[in-house]
Amino acid sequence: MSTEAEPRVLREVVLSQLATGESRAYKMWLPPLTDPTPVNELVERDYQRRPLRFGLGIMDEPRRHRQEVWGVDVSAAGGNIAVGGAPQTGKSTFLQTLVVSAAATHTPRQVQFYCVDLGGGGLMYLEDLPHVGGVATRAEPDRVNRVVAEVKAVLRAREQVFKQYRVGSIASYREMRDDPSNPASQDPFGDVFLVIDGWPAFVAEFPDLEPAVQDIAGQGLAYGVHVIITTPRWTELKSRVRDYLGTKIEFRLGDVNETQIDRITREIPANRPGRAVSLEKHHLMMGVPRLDGVHSADNIVEAISSAVQQIAGRHTDQAPQVRVLPERIYLHQLDPNPPGPDSDYRTRWQVPLGVRESDLTVAYNQMHLTPHLLIFGAPKSGKTRIAHAVAQAICKRNSPQQVRFMLADYRSGLLDAVPQSHLLDAGAINRNSATLEEAIKALAVNLKKRLPPPDLTTAQLRARSWWSGPDVVLLVDDWHMVTAAAGMVSPMAPLGPLLPAAADIGLHVIVTCQMSMAHRATMDKFVGAAYGAGSPTLFLSGEKNDFPSRDIIVKKRPPGQAFLVGPDGKEVIQAAYVDPPEEEVFSPPSEGS
């Protein structure tokens, strides 16, 4: 039997030798973008990685025969991001990837995220990241307001810091924050991101917040404050906001003619979530928010939870959390150390009303300048409790020689609101129209004597030296009941001509009224005069049609929450509260008595 090898042709010899070589032929055609890349691989493969650049996906560049990590550098003009795409194309997952990528490469001191989730709830899975200061959903309207207010407060505070320390750019400010000896290092906020998933729903449900977001988008980049917005249609994003969003990412659109980038978006395959097009007109496959190396969106909730735990384990610091308005704020919490009767007039008549939603500081009524207060609200909205709190605050600041009260209290809702020592000696408590009318006439006669003579100097007017005696507070609970019982002539008519001079003669008017009667009350000669003079007005819970107005937001609110309109502007507050007096319980007489 022959052992000689069968002869081989030259081709076979060459091919066998080439197959064992280390060099391979150049691959002109790279694999299609089908599977998403996890964040941990995006971070490892991103050769452009640097501070404030987030690796977000894989970009296909067919002309250069390359597929490399695509990301966004938020330190530059593209620091605001708009994401467009039809439902179920991967927009919310993209936001998750962005936040996880940023958290994987930055500390909670460097970047913070404040999220409004009006999409499918995907951002809530990121709430435990130390880089996330808060996530608000459509079921938490007060929290949504606070998220936007918190970010806007950061912007306003940073504007003041830039002015104070003459900071020329946000790049310089970042360096200042990194210097422990610099006062800017005390700023707990780094680059702050307001993330809104579902812009059309945001505008529809929170129309009053749209100008605030526009303001942040327009001014924020210069101060390290960013906006990221998703929308299913570009037409939903009005130009006054869209033009401020320098980076645009486009997933598959419902109507490709709406593209903001290029008709190349029509080439994005259907039913392929995560596929998108960048401003560079390159196809992208966005990553997935996981750190386990799996190229899939399967079991993504568990993967996100694991990634959050892994990142949280690396850090001990935490992004400042969103603070929310308390459901109830007691007067003693709001005003723990009120100024006493020895204080000057201006200080004594700076009366706390509640806590501002914008920055959680105390809102005051400067009653030395704007001597009146109007309170409108639906039943059980807190009108009378607020009147109690304001009356108590005034009494704590002023002695009986400095202030006296007259009450119109048809419903006996003001029991114990004012101590006996601070009531007028005569006509102080009025529970029907007859006694109120007589008391008002007597009060008007006395107050007319305080009207300033025409020859007073400016100094005398300021000091109110031409009369002496206590200021008088007319506290009217349930104005609608007073007017209904009065008939044709209001019992307040004698005081009407005195209201323009109220600050000069020491007259203060506090009125509560049903929201359904608010519009009518502001047309009244008495309450309307106070309202028209710019008196601070609280609009508590009510129906929108109770007080039709473009400028005033009337809606259903929790008890004590109000829309405050005053000389300093408009804002939401949680008004001060005091407990109602304890009711005496009378036991039935015993059988033997």
UniProtKB/Swiss-Prot annotation:
GO molecular function, one term: ATP hydrolysis activity
Cellular compartment(s): Cytoplasm
Matches recorded under PROSITE patterns: FTSK
Pfam families per record: FtsK_SpoIIIE
UniProt: ATP binding residues: 85-92, 377-384
Inactivation phenotype: Loss of DNA conjugation when disrupted in recipient strain, strain does not secrete EsxB.
Complexes and interactors: Part of the ESX-1 / type VII secretion system (T7SS), which is composed of cytosolic and membrane components. The ESX-1 membrane complex is composed of EccB1, EccCa1, EccCb1, EccD1 and EccE1.
Name listed for the protein in its UniProt record: ESX-1 secretion system protein EccCb1
Source organism per UniProt: Mycolicibacterium smegmatis (strain MKD8) (Mycobacterium smegmatis)
Lineage: Bacteria, Bacillati, Actinomycetota, Actinomycetes, Mycobacteriales
